[in-house]
Amino acid sequence: MRGLFTAGILDVMMEHDIKVDGIVGVSAGACFGCNYVSRQIGRALRYNMNMKDDPRYMGIRSLIRSGNLMDAEFAYHTLPDEIDPFDKKTFAQSSTEFHVVCTDVITGDPVYKRLTAPVDYEFMEWIRASSALPLVSHPVELDGRLLLDGGMSDSIPLKYFQKQGFEHNIVILTQPLGFTKKRTKLMPLFRAFMKKYPAVIELMNRRHIMYNAQLEYLAHEQQAGRATLIAPDDTLPIGRTQQSGKRMQLVYKMGREAAEKAFSL
């Protein structure tokens, strides 16, 4: 739920009509970034607050029943279609490009996808794939590939967006300045449960190296005036899947405050 920090930033940007030409979302950034394009202020916090205690949304019951911590059908289709509708019309009319990043579990390569109208079942499946956490999600099959969380292969896709022609980029991190990633302590679990996907095991074993290199590149681009960085001042007081309403609201508020500071509002 660290992504609610991003949601807070995007809501402030919408409220103050701060427009960008494109967004690339990774993992929770894909789930929440689409709301910027559809101009739905408050939607990300609202549905997460409303659904936090609903076993149909996410939790151990879903994981045991389906192998997915986030219920694939309910969270990514029923919710945006019926319960808290995603504004498909506004998304389709927007000039803002929306891209997501996934990881091919066979090759270990990042897979980039620009999502355009119509906002249909496959559209939401790409968002699901980008945010499908390893170990607690089945790979999502799209375009002949098996896909999981994009953060495994490209956590900070700044170079990708620069190659798309975006010369100055606002980069939102959910870790504070000075953070350096260490090798995950979950490697025994990856080796035990991801044997079918050796590329994923290798990715996770060296992900900290790739991530820290991306941080160095981001710092270089920021110094050169080609990137604006927004990050929390302190470690966000919430876990990736934690569903405490109080903590979710706090993290969202921290995002809003970070945006107000970054844009001098």
Cite the ranges covered by each PLM segment.
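Patatin-like phospholipase
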Residues: 1-26, 34-265
